[in-house]
Each structure stands twice: as C-alpha cells, then as structure tokens.
C-alpha cells in the first residue's frame, strides 16, 4: 500500500478498549496522516468514564450519543452517518473503523465500493464478514504498547 495522505478514524467506544487506543493511533499513523479522530459513545455512562483522560491527551473528538431507549444505544448509527458525511466530502483516501461489531460491515462495503482504502481494528472475535470487507484488518491483541502489530491483509 502506498502512503495515505488523509485518514479518517472513527472509534466505537462502546466496543473498544481505551487501553489500546494510543497503540491503534501509532499503528495507523504508519500508513499516513490521521486528520480525523472521533470516538462515539454515551459519555454519561459509567463504562466510558475512563476514556476522558485519554481522549483529551490524544486529541480525539468525543461525539456524544445518548441512548434514546433503555437497553439500546444509538452509537452505531451516529458513527455511520458521520462516516458517510466524511466520505462524501471527498477529501479522505482512507477510513479506519475501530470496533469489533459486525454492524459496521455495510459501512465497510460502502466505503470500499467508493474507492477508499478501508482499515478495520478490533478484537479476534470480530466477525469475518466485517474483517474481510476491510482492505486491512488489525487485531487489537496484536498491538503492543509500543505500537508494533501483526496485520491481516487481503
């Protein structure tokens, strides 16, 4: 892969470990310049309280998404809508989706069909359908604190 000029990275905080985010950013930065770093979640939830310090330190834009119905979050939908808006801006040559959620498979397909490079980052449990629709998928378990990884490439 050639060096990418402008990378947009979107993070599903509900399905990602904050302890790995710095290593993810370091790894993705090897491919090019990350110009968008956004994390989506309901930051009012106790489960995401530990993200605040890292979000500030790593200059990630936190996108608040409230849960409109008990037991159901809207984070996935907000992330997808924003990503499609970024795609139609026509200024990014790569998108990184950080999540282990198979719900992002249609998004990866749309991005891929639009001709941009698609990278996924998630746990080994990430469904194959999502992993294979990415041009490259990086397993969180393979990222060390120093940012070295073993990526699965197509």
Residue ranges and their predicted role:
Residues 72, 125-129, 145-147:
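Short gly/pro/ser/thr-enriched loop/turn and capping motifs at secondary-structure boundaries
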Residues 15-17, 43-46, 102-104, 125-126, ...:
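Conserved nucleotide-binding/hydrolysis micro-motifs of P-loop NTPases
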Residues 108-140:
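VWA/integrin I-like adhesion module and closely mimicked acidic/polar interface patches used
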Residues 13, 67, 100, 116, ...:
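Short, ordered loop/turn segments at secondary-structure junctions
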Residues 146-154:
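N-terminal regulatory modules in eukaryotic regulatory proteins
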Residues 40, 93-100, 107, 111, ...:
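Acidic beta-strand-to-loop metal/phosphate-binding motif
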Residues 7, 93, 135:
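Conserved acidic residues
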Residues 1-88, 109-110, 117:
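Domain-level signal for Mg2+-assisted phosphodiester chemistry and nucleotide/NA-binding surfaces
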